[in-house]
């Protein structure tokens, strides 16, 4: 039976505006088949929820998560999941669109404090998923796809996350590559296949290093 690499994140992990996501070449290098749950516009709430649910009901051998920006949240409206982000406009096909837009506007004003609420939520989400995966014996690699930590972070959860399975916590990988390869990025800051192949190589090297250190 093939081993399964499960990936999750936002548009960067999904491979928006690129023919491929880094997930496919990474899984091929690891000799695995891939499942990519990433959703453009999705936040860290969704990453944790869908990763845990998938691992509870499916065989998973390795998890790669590219964390996204702090302010994104999930809400249930008309029995459906909707994904909030700063300035997000509700799609026209949503019933009672005006009511959901009022909620999003309220959240933009009062629920997006990056330095307290956003940071708190993100760290607890990451620690929750880390603990879940380790409890089930599933190997993993975390990295920041977009939005990085600063070195003066003061929170009791933060030291618990700092190991070789959280790659470059003080960097945001897709932001770094935009500085290195700006000609391969769209106006919406999405990398093309050249970026994704380079990131696949970098993540594979990190996974290989950490695997050798543990054997």
Q: Which positions does each model-derived feature cover?
A:
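Alpha-helical cap/lid subdomain in secreted, periplasmic
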Residues: 52-215
């Amino acid at each position: 039976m093939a081993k399964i690499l499960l990936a999750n994140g936002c548009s960067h992990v999904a491979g928006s505006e690129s023919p491929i996501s880094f997930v496919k070449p990474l899984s091929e290098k690891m000799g695995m088949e891939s499942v990519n749950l990433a959703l453009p516009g999705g936040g860290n709430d969704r990453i944790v929820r869908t990763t845990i649910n998938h691992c509870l009901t499916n065989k998973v051998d390795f998890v790669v998560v590219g964390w996204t920006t702090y302010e994104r949240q999930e809400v249930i409206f008309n029995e459906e999941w909707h994904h909030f982000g700063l300035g997000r406009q509700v799609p026209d096909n949503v019933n009672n669109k005006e009511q959901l837009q009022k909620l999003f506007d309220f959240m933009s004003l009062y629920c997006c404090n990056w330095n307290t609420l956003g940071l708190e939520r993100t760290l607890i989400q990451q620690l929750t998923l880390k603990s879940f995966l380790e409890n089930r014996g599933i190997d993993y690699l975390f990295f920041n796809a977009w939005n990085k930590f600063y070195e003066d972070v003061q929170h009791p959860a933060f030291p618990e996350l700092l190991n070789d399975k959280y790659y470059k916590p003080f960097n945001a990988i897709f932001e770094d590559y935009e500085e290195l390869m700006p000609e391969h990025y769209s106006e919406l800051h999405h990398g093309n296949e050249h970026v994704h192949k380079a990131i696949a190589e970098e993540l594979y090297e990190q996974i290989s290093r950490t695997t050798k250190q543990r054997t």
